[in-house]
Amino acid sequence: MTTANCGAHDELDFKLVFGEDGAPAPPPPGSRPADLEPDDCASIYIFNVDPPPSTLTTPLCLPHHGLPSHSSVLSPSFQLQSHKNYEGTCEIPESKYSPLGGPKPFECPSIQITSISPNCHQELDAHEDDLQINDPEREFLERPSRDHLYLPLEPSYRESSLSPSPASSISSRSWFSDASSCESLSHIYDDVDSELNEAAARFTLGSPLTSPGGSPGGCPGEETWHQQYGLGHSLSPRQSPCHSPRSSVTDENWLSPRPASGPSSRPTSPCGKRRHSSAEVCYAGSLSPHHSPVPSPGHSPRGSVTEDTWLNASVHGGSGLGPAVFPFQYCVETDIPLKTRKTSEDQAAILPGKLELCSDDQGSLSPARETSIDDGLGSQYPLKKDSCGDQFLSVPSPFTWSKPKPGHTPIFRTSSLPPLDWPLPAHFGQCELKIEVQPKTHHRAHYETEGSRGAVKASTGGHPVVKLLGYNEKPINLQMFIGTADDRYLRPHAFYQVHRITGKTVATASQEIIIASTKVLEIPLLPENNMSASIDCAGILKLRNSDIELRKGETDIGRKNTRVRLVFRVHIPQPSGKVLSLQIASIPVECSQRSAQELPHIEKYSINSCSVNGGHEMVVTGSNFLPESKIIFLEKGQDGRPQWEVEGKIIREKCQGAHIVLEVPPYHNPAVTAAVQVHFYLCNGKRKKSQSQRFTYTPVLMKQEHREEIDLSSVPSLPVPHPAQTQRPSSDSGCSHDSVLSGQRSLICSIPQTYASMVTSSHLPQLQCRDESVSKEQHMIPSPIVHQPFQVTPTPPVGSSYQPMQTNVVYNGPTCLPINAASSQEFDSVLFQQDATLSGLVNLGCQPLSSIPFHSSNSGSTGHLLAHTPHSVHTLPHLQSMGYHCSNTGQRSLSSPVADQITGQPSSQLQPITYGPSHSGSATTASPAASHPLASSPLSGPPSPQLQPMPYQSPSSGTASSPSPATRMHSGQHSTQAQSTGQGGLSAPSSLICHSLCDPASFPPDGATVSIKPEPEDREPNFATIGLQDITLDDVNEIIGRDMSQISVSQGAGVSRQAPLPSPESLDLGRSDGL
């Protein structure tokens, strides 16, 4: 290329060269840069060149810069280097047109332009550098008509190996590397017209800037650089420094195909807008002076420069633009971070778009300025290192946020805040963004052609309220935008935008900003307002469906996408200088009047969970319900596709208007062991569906209280009983403890049998007790007892002594079966001696029950031992005689020792707890449910109120009142009733477990009485865990009858002497002092 075409064109060419910063050195007379074309730089020319002696005739555009001299000087070396030397870049034009073959014509205008423009820029730069170029090259330099859209490209463009000289490989050919091949460029860039226009404009505008002289590091710099480094080879070292960001890039590397460099380099071109490699080359032209000397450095300053760009620029710059580029490259080298990474072709192709932003400005800027701009871009968009095959600096691709990454720490730099579609948590650390008042579920959005319909209202009146918790140091902005409300991840809504509302009634300040084409409303959160804001300044604007649907890549349909969410986001400053980003979205808001009138809407539903067996009735309340409405339950997999879908059975006769009653269908997998969340929705047709609501299926076992199950065989190994204690406030002492019977699973179970045993042991202990403080006998009519859960705590054994009771009952049946010992003649009250001390553990195993000493330190305080189990248990501190009546099998009454425990100050009076079961059956039979060890354990704590009698009606069918143990505990100085409610088998894996007879809250103050009628429970006792599967009621009756026959009358008399008969009043059901 010669300076013959210089002049106005030369100036343009120079500018273009700088902008392109990659103009290849003018090829030798025989070589013609085919890839140069007036893409982005005015200095680029497309020429039909008569085949010079060394070149094939090919139209091509050459910069007017003085690149020829460099090219001529460097071309030999370049050819020798086989494209590995940056010098070769200067000579690239030659190699492009080298004898290897004439440049291959590309019929794709955009591609030709792209390829040509980089080369042209470079070549123009070379001309501006006053490099000597053959006349044919000058001809090439002549501005070709815009009609010449294609340029024959030499194979060297695509394959550096094709061009004999390294320089040629470096030239635009190099930028036509595999990644930057015209084909790739062609498919990357499709707006040929715009590119042509840009190229034409840059012909006139870019050349001045492109010219080396015009640029800070003009041709003189390039020449100087050449002088410093001598041949192109010397330039290559320099080039690599310039590419320092890519300093690691070797001549081979940058010469190696840089597919993406061409496209990505487009940003480098002054016409950054050009998406074609030519554009990149043009930009490189501006950078080319620097790039050519140091192709990689030149591009590195333009971290955004792609392989093609910096290769072309470097090649052309090395040849003609080298000097000018050198200074430019030097600056670039310093400007571009050393860590700059080369991007892949794709990245390069994408990046040009970013670079376009500054391409126009850069076109008018001097090469140095362009370089700085490019550098800024490069630093802003770090380059990504490609495989060894792509060792070129590609234009950094714009940073694009990938799809939501759940679990990502929401800490961001202020310079790179997350995009609006980035998922953020609502709570992190001590900070939480919260919507205190949700918006209404319907708000009619207004169109652009109509007036505002006001701000979004709240369902409770007023407006939504948003508050930030955990931070109040200084005011921050609350950002609000309209987001989607579909099943996909949250993102800005395509068809709705937030609309700022102003007026006298608006109390909240706000301002609108645009973030990525989305309108965002900024509302201040002030510490004086407790970091809270009422959103009375936000309306919803509906965009035209056609405007959105016609957008490239838009797949949503406006009329089917009318639900939105109000999305709020804050960026909280952190001490590190970064920000913590939080985001919260409101409930879905329907913005279409038609949809609001036609689509069903579920406002509430009666239950939100049930067992996997289903069958429960659910009442759904809402609007737009029709007689033919259906409710569908479905479960979605991780991929969002339905895995299970079933229709709920609607009970039509119970449905009324806005209420639908349905039967929850069973879950498809009843064997689940954990709760499963599904969804349900109401539909009036295929396209009219309500929002999905959540529903939970729970395993059957989840409805039961899980308690460790202890095999009876392992029970004896338990060393210490665990008395159950329930603490509750007391009127005088503060808390009392109630001992109760415990069920194995703490489930309420009704006992079909008519009796429950009071004492479970192979031998009934002989108990001789006398009541010193209470003259009134306590009578208990056995009946099923409710076992309620309570806190079980171990207690130390209580030592006590007692006189053996004369009544000795031998039990020959199963050791686990309880025995009720009583007189078969009449009511025998067994009075337990209160001041007798309990001195040891009572072993209630298979061996005869040892004497149990009971001691009461306080008069009037009583304790009761409900059951003795085969386990080793601590006996209760105090025992109280309790009489119970039996009207079955000829036994009038049975007296069984019942330990009534008290801990604390004496109670003023003990009240009998009476139960009136309606079972029919033999008098004292052990209920299988009661076979579990039952024990009342002492309860620690301050004095508790006294127990009041509690009437109990057994739900079981029957007419006779059958004996069953009842517990009565009283540990208190004053009387606060301990209420016992419920029924069920007395089955507990541990003999030391007791359940409180009633909820602590139910205890009234002193003197007050409460009568509770427990609801019947139809659950059968669980014998599987009891070990009584083979025991029948008949066996129990036989055993009890046999044992009772062994009781001597004398023993019964002795007991009766010690304990006076109970008064008839105490036998009445439900009668007590407090009742």
UniProtKB/Swiss-Prot annotation:
Sequence repeats lie at residues 207-223, 236-252, 292-308. A motif (Nuclear localization signal) lies at residues 273-275, 686-688. The modification N-acetylthreonine is found at T2. Residues 256-270, 916-939, 949-967 have a biased composition (Low complexity). GO terms for biological process: calcineurin-NFAT signaling cascade; DN4 thymocyte differentiation; inflammatory response; negative regulation of miRNA transcription; negative regulation of vascular associated smooth muscle cell differentiation; positive regulation of artery morphogenesis; positive regulation of nitric oxide biosynthetic process; positive regulation of transcription by RNA polymerase II. Acts as a regulator of transcriptional activation. Binds to the TNFSF11/RANKL promoter region and promotes TNFSF11 transcription. Binding to the TNFSF11 promoter region is increased by high levels of Ca(2+) which induce NFATC3 expression and may lead to regulation of TNFSF11 expression in osteoblasts. Plays a role in promoting mesenteric arterial wall remodeling in response to the intermittent hypoxia-induced increase in EDN1 and ROCK signaling. This is Nuclear factor of activated T-cells, cytoplasmic 3. It comes from Homo sapiens (Human). The gene is NFATC3.
